[in-house]
C-alpha cells in the first residue's frame, strides 16, 4: 500500500537532497513499504536518482576545423622536433669523428714519446761510456804524471 507524504519542512527536503546529491525537488515522495523503495512525483529541476550513478554528459564539442588545426599544430611540432633531432644527430657524428681523430693523435704522440724515451736512454748510456772513458784516461794521466 502506498502513502503519499509531502515534505513536511525544509530540513526534510535538504536531507533528501543530501541523499541524492544532485538537483532540487519540489513535490511529493511516495513510500512503497512492500518494495522498500521511494518514488517521487512533482517538479524536478535536475536529474534525481537514489543509489544510481548519474552519468554527466560532456557538452564540450570540437569542430572539424579545430581538430584539423590541432592536428596541423601537432604535425608542425613533430616536424620541428624531428629536425632538431636530426641536427643533434649530425652534431653527435661530428663530435664522434673529432674524438676519433684526437684518439689517433694521442696514439701517435705516445709512439713519439716512446721513441724519444728510447733515444734519451741510448744517449744516457753513451754518456756513461764517455764518462767511463774519461775516468780511465784520467787514471792513466795520473799514473804517467805523479807530480801532483
UniProtKB/Swiss-Prot annotation:
Domain of life: Bacteria
Family to which the UniProt record says this protein belongs: Belongs to the UPF0134 family.
Taxon lineage: Bacteria, Bacillati, Mycoplasmatota, Mycoplasmoidales, Mycoplasmoidaceae
UniProt-recorded name of the protein: UPF0134 protein MPN_204
A Pfam family recorded for this sequence: DUF16
Gene3D superfamilies per UniProt: 6.10.250.40
InterPro entries xref list: DUF16
Amino acid at each position: 500500500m502506498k502513502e503519499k507524504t509531502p515534505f513536511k519542512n525544509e530540513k526534510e527536503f535538504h536531507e533528501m537532497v543530501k541523499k541524492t546529491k544532485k538537483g532540487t525537488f519540489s513535490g511529493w515522495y511516495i513510500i512503497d513499504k512492500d518494495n522498500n523503495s521511494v518514488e517521487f512525483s512533482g517538479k524536478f529541476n535536475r536529474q534525481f536518482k537514489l543509489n544510481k550513478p548519474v552519468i554527466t554528459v560532456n557538452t564540450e564539442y570540437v569542430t572539424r576545423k579545430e581538430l584539423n588545426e590541432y592536428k596541423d599544430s601537432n604535425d608542425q611540432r613533430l616536424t620541428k622536433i624531428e629536425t632538431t633531432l636530426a641536427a643533434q644527430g649530425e652534431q653527435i657524428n661530428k663530435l664522434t669523428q673529432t674524438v676519433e681523430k684526437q684518439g689517433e693523435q694521442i696514439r701517435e704522440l705516445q709512439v713519439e714519446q716512446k721513441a724519444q724515451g728510447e733515444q734519451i736512454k741510448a744517449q744516457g748510456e753513451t754518456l756513461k761510456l764517455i764518462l767511463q772513458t774519461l775516468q780511465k784516461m784520467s787514471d792513466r794521466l795520473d799514473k804517467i804524471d805523479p807530480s801532483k
